[in-house]
A protein has these predicted regions:
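Conserved thiamine diphosphate
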Residues: 1-128, 137, 153
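Short, proline-centered helix/strand-breaking motifs
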Residues: 34, 163, 177-179
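Single conserved hydrophobic/aromatic residue that forms the stacking wall/gate
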Residues: 174-185
Length: 185
């Protein structure tokens, strides 16, 4: 279908996607075909049992040439990523999301999707938390706990898992902590 000019969207559980590794590599990515992989149940899925955990897709998808991998922070970003993948992109792309109803938090942060670029959620000075997908929920909770202790926390939505936004590595320059015997500088 993709070789014929269509834009197929393949919706699949993460645990079943691994069975198609060879086809993804040879029939889609090496040929640089525009296929969108909508990967449901990505990550740990406790109630689905040990054989249906979506824990391997990151390792094998990021090793495939020409594959882009994204993870939305919430339902709105999932919709924006699908639109980006279908209308503004022309290569293999995977969008991975967890099981269950889409998270509706962080709605106030909706920077336009630019290829390979992370989204700055909150920029402060002490500690930087960089997370992708539903791990932003955890990052937000950690930020609240650390804020109570007086820390200023940056949160970055690393919406592209591959390619990684290397500009975000510059965050380490302003968030470096040099331990000393009695304090941190």
């Amino acid at each position: 279908m993709a070789a014929g000019g269509l834009k197929p969207v393949f919706a699949v559980y993460s645990s079943f996607l691994q069975r198609a590794y060879d086809q993804i590599l040879h029939d889609v990515c090496i040929q640089h075909l525009h296929v969108v992989f909508a990967i449901d149940r990505a990550g740990l899925v406790g109630s689905d049992g040990e054989t249906h955990q979506g824990i391997f897709d990151l390792s094998f998808l990021t090793s495939i040439p020409n594959m882009t991998v994204m993870a939305p922070k919430n339902g709105s970003e999932l919709s924006a990523m699908l639109e980006f993948a279908l209308l503004n992109f022309n290569s293999p792309i995977a969008i991975r999301y967890p099981r269950g109803q889409a998270y509706d938090g962080l709605e106030e942060y909706n920077a336009p999707i630019r290829y390979g670029k992370a989204e700055m959620i909150i920029e402060e000075s002490d500690i930087a938390l960089v997370a992708a997908g539903n791990m932003l929920i955890t990052a937000q909770a950690v930020r609240e706990k650390l804020k109570e202790k007086g820390y200023n926390i940056t949160i970055v939505n690393e919406r592209f898992i591959k390619p990684v936004d290397t500009d975000m590595l510059d965050l380490s320059l302003i968030h470096i902590s040099e331990p000393t015997r009695h304090a941190q500088i």
